[in-house]
């Protein structure tokens, strides 16, 4: 399986706001990312890469098992996302009809705050998504 992380890291750097680069050099090997359960009883896990998503600008990896689907939901902040691993689907609920878009690794989407949407991992194996937010 090809490693998309180097090219996706360049994409992430290209879309990050300028102030995010005022950091010291830091490294976080993939096997050291401190994943935590997002919600009790749910399988999705969050791995913080930089910042704190509950406080401000942040980059976070989301891991979900294969064939997982979220309920229709909304977030309190805008976010950008890049598919790292697996086949992802994202639905917009605008106009009362959902429009599903399938997103393979390397794909990108944005989501506005307070807009209802749905997400799913269509792969049989886990999906990994890079979530980037500027506000909590």
Locations of regions flagged by a protein language model:
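Bacterial N-terminal signal peptides that target proteins for export
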Residues: 1-9
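Ligand-binding loop in jelly-roll beta-barrel domains
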Residues: 113-136
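Short acidic-glycine-tyrosine-enriched beta hairpin
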Residues: 54, 88, 95-114
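Conserved short histidine dyad/triad with adjacent acidic residue
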Residues: 58-75, 103, 112-113
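Glycine- and acidic-residue-biased ligand/ion/polar-headgroup-sensing regions
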Residues: 65-66, 75-95
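A short, N-terminal "cap"/entry segment at the start of jelly-roll beta-barrel domains
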Residues: 20-58, 101
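Bacterial N-terminal signal peptides
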Residues: 8-17
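Conserved hydrophobic/aromatic beta-strand scaffold that supports enzyme active sites
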Residues: 48, 59-63, 80, 100, ...
């Amino acid at each position: 399986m090809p490693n998309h992380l180097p090219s996706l890291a360049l994409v992430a750097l290209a879309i990050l706001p300028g102030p995010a680069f005022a950091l010291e050099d830091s490294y976080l090997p993939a096997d050291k990312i401190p994943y935590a359960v997002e919600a009790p009883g749910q399988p999705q896990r969050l791995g913080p890469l930089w910042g704190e998503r509950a406080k401000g600008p942040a980059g976070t990896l989301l891991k979900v098992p294969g064939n997982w689907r979220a309920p229709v939901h909304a977030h309190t902040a805008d976010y950008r996302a890049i598919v790292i691993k697996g086949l992802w689907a994202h639905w917009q609920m605008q106009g009362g009809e959902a429009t599903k878009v399938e997103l393979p690794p390397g794909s990108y989407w944005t989501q506005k705050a307070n807009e209802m949407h749905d997400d799913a991992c269509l792969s049989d194996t886990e999906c990994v998504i890079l979530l980037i937010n500027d506000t909590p």
